[in-house]
Amino acid sequence: MKQVQTKRDWKKLAYDVVEEKMITKEDAIAILEADDTEVLEIMNAAYIIRHHHFGKKVKLNMIINTKSGLCPEDCGYCSQSIISEAPIDKYAWLTQEKIVEGAHEAIRRKAGTYCIVASGRRPTDKEVNHVIGAVKEIRETTDLKICCCLGFLNEDQAGLLAEAGVHRYNHNLNTHANNYDSICSTHTYDDRVDTVQKAKQAGISPCSGAIFGMGETIEERAEIAFELQRIDADSIPCNFLVAVKGTPLEGQKELTPVDCLKVLAMMRFVNPTKEIRISGGREINLRSVQPIGLFAANSIFVGDYLTTAGQEPTADWGMIADLGFEIEECAL
């Protein structure tokens, strides 16, 4: 005789989280394994937590790819890696003027955070100074928050970025420690954690998340959320694999739109006070249920990603307005 699974009271679990009672790994796995018919109840419960901490505000972030391709690392998901055969634009560093122009475009797109991203294993000191020159001008002429994602950092470089006024440093964990060797062989999971810690020690707010759909188990997905809690990432980008043609993960498809919603909800339950961002792969993986994702997440990228296209900013603004939510705009 088939055993009937007892339905969870997701709202009660959410109110427990609001009262600062942490959920267990078993609770997180239960969210991920819940029947698809429960997803709206789960998202409604996640919204209780999201609304308690962030109300109806949605943070917008814009990326500029300041150096594309030419990366010596062999990350299997990445179109910019040395082993990728993806037909992407490849170019060396943009000028400081172009980086500053991008900041003003971010404001036009109603973004509050401007993300300066460069491919590569780690920046040279000269490259860090190049970024710092642009950062200082952006800080003098706008009220944007600035995030940098430049690869591995040493302590001196992290300190210089902090001194220049960089608010946040992004360095994703990408996948579970157990799964890391199957994704990349040119650096380790611990290398990535080390850079997150160096940024934090320098006084920069750490931004770190993962790419879901790269062969990790359900249990590992839950453990990633708790690892991000452990390292105290202030901002958590949830990326969903875009299996780019020409990369080793080409054609891999593990996630349904409902799976993605469950990941976002689980991340909100585990990290209730943190900025949860629906990041790369949003349009491709969530498709028509993108708006529902914002009942758990409180942040998105506006415009294009590093090498893949996003939807038009007007579509994102409209989606947010249709939900009755509000853009947390940059103060001009």
From Swiss-Prot:
Name the Gene Ontology molecular function terms of this record: 2 iron, 2 sulfur cluster binding; 4 iron, 4 sulfur cluster binding; biotin synthase activity; iron ion binding
Q: Which InterPro entries match?
A: Aldolase_TIM, BATS_dom, Biotin_synth/BioAB, Biotin_synthase, Elp3/MiaA/NifB-like_rSAM, rSAM
Give TM regions: none
Its domain of life?
Bacteria
Residues involved in [2Fe-2S] cluster binding:
C115, C147, C207, R277
Details of cofactor binding? Binds 1 [4Fe-4S] cluster. The cluster is coordinated with 3 cysteines and an exchangeable S-adenosyl-L-methionine.
Q: Please give the pathway this protein is involved in.
A: Cofactor biosynthesis; biotin biosynthesis; biotin from 7,8-diaminononanoate: step 2/2
Which CDD domains does this entry report, sorted A to Z?
Radical_SAM
What UniProt keywords are attached to this protein's entry? Answer: 2Fe-2S, 4Fe-4S, Biotin biosynthesis, Iron, Iron-sulfur, Metal-binding, S-adenosyl-L-methionine, Transferase
Q: Which Pfam families match?
A: BATS, Radical_SAM
Q: Which reaction does it catalyse?
A: (4R,5S)-dethiobiotin + (sulfur carrier)-SH + 2 reduced [2Fe-2S]-[ferredoxin] + 2 S-adenosyl-L-methionine = (sulfur carrier)-H + biotin + 2 5'-deoxyadenosine + 2 L-methionine + 2 oxidized [2Fe-2S]-[ferredoxin]
The cofactors named for this UniProt entry are:
[4Fe-4S] cluster; [2Fe-2S] cluster
Q: Which SUPFAM superfamilies match?
A: Radical SAM enzymes
Q: Please name the GO terms of the biological process aspect recorded for this protein, alphabetically.
A: biotin biosynthetic process
Where do the Radical SAM core domain residues begin and end? 53-282
Gene3D superfamilies membership: Aldolase class I
Binding residues annotated for [4Fe-4S] cluster, in chain numbering: C71, C75, C78
Does the keyword Metal-binding belong to this entry? yes
Identify the EC number(s).
Answer: 2.8.1.6
Q: Note the subunit structure.
A: Homodimer.
Q: Which PANTHER family match?
A: BIOTIN SYNTHASE, BIOTIN SYNTHASE, MITOCHONDRIAL
Q: What does this protein do?
A: Catalyzes the conversion of dethiobiotin (DTB) to biotin by the insertion of a sulfur atom into dethiobiotin via a radical-based mechanism.
Family as reported in the entry's similarity comment: Belongs to the radical SAM superfamily. Biotin synthase family.
**What is the name attached to this protein's record?**
Biotin synthase
- Species annotation: Bacillus cereus (strain B4264)
| Gene designation | bioB
